Amino acid sequence: MQYFEDIPIGQKQAFGSYQVTREEVLAFATKFDPQSFHLDDEAAAKTHFGRVSASGWHTCAMTMAMLVENMKGRKQAGLGSPGVDELRWLKPVFPGDTLRCETEVFEKRRSASRPEMGIFKSRAKVFNQHDEPVLSTTSIGLVAVRDQNAEITG
């Protein structure tokens, strides 16, 4: 199990391989972001996207799927997240793309009010199969500490 104490500042990881399918793009857009450029080839061709593209929120969901799969593989003692500080959609994601993720932890601290919990911040970048960045985010993670009675330092 990976606890707060096991996560060093500067830790970098590269992981994931998410195949974006047309069916999934259309299903997500139909339910959550039914704009024509996510659903209709003809309408999308007339936009700056040029063709049907995934919703940015769908790209976030695909990113989350890769992050959680990586966390499960490392058996991280994750306790959720209070949110995201920054989110940027850098390039459209299209059916047929293959996504991967890179992360780096840049800050961490023990919670003063919840001694059983550590807080860390990380940057994530998602790339397509051409190594073009399509999404970047700065997020906050909560993770269990190994010994909540230990002195609260970093």
Positions of PLM-derived features:
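HotDog/MaoC-like acyl-thioester-processing domains
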Residues: 2-9, 92-154
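Mid-chain, well-packed structural core segment of small domains
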Residues: 73-97, 101
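Hot-dog-fold acyl-thioester-processing enzymes
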Residues: 1-83, 148-154
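Generic structural detector for well-ordered beta-strands
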Residues: 14-19, 88, 140-142
